[in-house]
Structures are given as C-alpha cells and as structure tokens.
C-alpha cells in the first residue's frame, strides 16, 4: 500500500509539475543576418537566412542543448549568432499597483493591466479532443488553461507603452488570448536594445504545468511581434 501511495504521488507530481522554460534571443551578426544551415555544420547547405533582431525562442542552456547549434525554422543556427534578450539592459524594476504593474526607465514606460474575466462579454465554445475538451474564447485557443473544467479568472485589460513621450499602440490581438495573469515584479520585465531601438517586454503567467511566458517586441517605436514560450 505504501508503494502504491508513493507511485501515485510521483505520477500526480509529474503531471502538474512545471518543466524548464527556454530562452528568448535575437539574431545579432556583423553581416546583418545569419545563415540557417541544413545540418549542424558551418559547411552544411544554407537553407535560409534570418535578419538581425529576429526574435526566437529556443533552449540555449547547455544542460538542455549541449550543442553549439540551435534548431530554428527548417535548419540550424550557431549559438554565437544569437543574443539573449535578458542580456540587454533592463529599463527598471516593475512597480505593482492594484491590477497593474508599471516598468519605467530610460524614457520608456510600460504598463500591463489585468481584469477579471467576465464570461458574459465573450463568445465561449468548446473544442473536443480524444481525451478532453478545451475552451475556445472569442475564436482563439487560450493560454493559462488547457481544459473545460474551469473558466479563466482574469486576462489582460490593456498594455500601454510610451517611448520618449510617444504612445506605441499595442493591438488587442497581441494579448487577448492570454489568461491567468501574474502582475508581480518577479514576473514582468522590460529590456531595451538602445543601438537598434528595440524594446522587449517579457511576462510570466499561468501556474504549474499551465505556466507560460510571452515576449513582445517593439522595433523603432512600432509593435512588431510576440512569441509565446511554454515549458518542456
């Protein structure tokens, strides 16, 4: 009986444990771009290129990727051609106030605000899979929940960014599928690449095996893209 209990605890712990996250990085090469190789070799066939400041999400830590090569798109890129976003200067530490957190510094102000989820204001459907069903909200797969047992508690109300007094519009589509928001200074960060005028905002949301992170990229005062990162 004791052995069965231990086995049960191990299985349930693994089921709800959060695995390691990857790293956000950008292409940085003196040539202005990096070659994508078919194989992990500098003499391998070039199957594509990525321009500088292309945002990627990969496992760069040697523990998970002992090779000097990273698999991106249809091939491989050498690690030396990537710079981790967290290596750029932080604009400052976030300050929490109610349902918002503001990160400010270097002429930049970033405010992320969450609000309770009101099911009466959204179209909610279910997508059935072989062994479970998941909620689809406003036609989108959602992050922070993975089944139809519970509706999300909260989601982003807005994300506002100003750079040197100029407002940077962030489209609703950049955050309207993100739920279970963490408004803490240990979950939210902003980094600025002054040389190329690129702002990166990173948020960690969700909990346990449903945790996720997101990085928004703003290039020369305009929103460009985002990448969602999920643990292994």
Locate each region found by the language model:
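Mature extracytoplasmic domains of secretory-pathway proteins
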Residues: 136-184, 188
């Amino acid at each position: 009986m004791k052995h069965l209990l231990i086995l049960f605890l191990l299985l349930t712990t693994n089921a709800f444990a959060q695995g390691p996250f990857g790293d956000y990085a950008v292409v940085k090469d003196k040539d202005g771009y990096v070659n994508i190789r078919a194989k992990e070799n500098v003499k391998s066939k070039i199957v594509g290129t990525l321009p500088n400041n292309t945002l990627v999400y990969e496992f760069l830590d040697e523990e998970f990727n002992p090779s000097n090569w990273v698999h991106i798109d249809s091939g491989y890129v050498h690690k030396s051609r990537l710079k981790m976003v967290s290596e750029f200067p932080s604009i400052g530490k976030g300050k929490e106030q109610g349902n918002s957190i503001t990160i400010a510094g270097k002429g930049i102000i970033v405010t992320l605000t969450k609000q309770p989820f009101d099911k009466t204001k959204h179209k909610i459907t279910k997508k059935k899979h072989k062994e479970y069903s998941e909620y689809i909200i406003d036609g989108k797969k959602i992050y922070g929940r993975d089944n139809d047992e519970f509706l999300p508690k909260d989601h982003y109300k807005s994300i506002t960014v100003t750079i040197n007094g100029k407002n940077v519009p962030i489209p609703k589509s950049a955050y309207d599928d993100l739920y279970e928001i963490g408004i803490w200074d240990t979950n939210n960060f902003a980094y600025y690449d002054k040389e190329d005028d690129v702002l990166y905002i990173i948020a960690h949301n969700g909990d346990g095996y449903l945790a996720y992170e997101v990085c928004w990229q703003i290039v020369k005062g305009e929103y460009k893209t985002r990448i969602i990162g999920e643990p292994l």
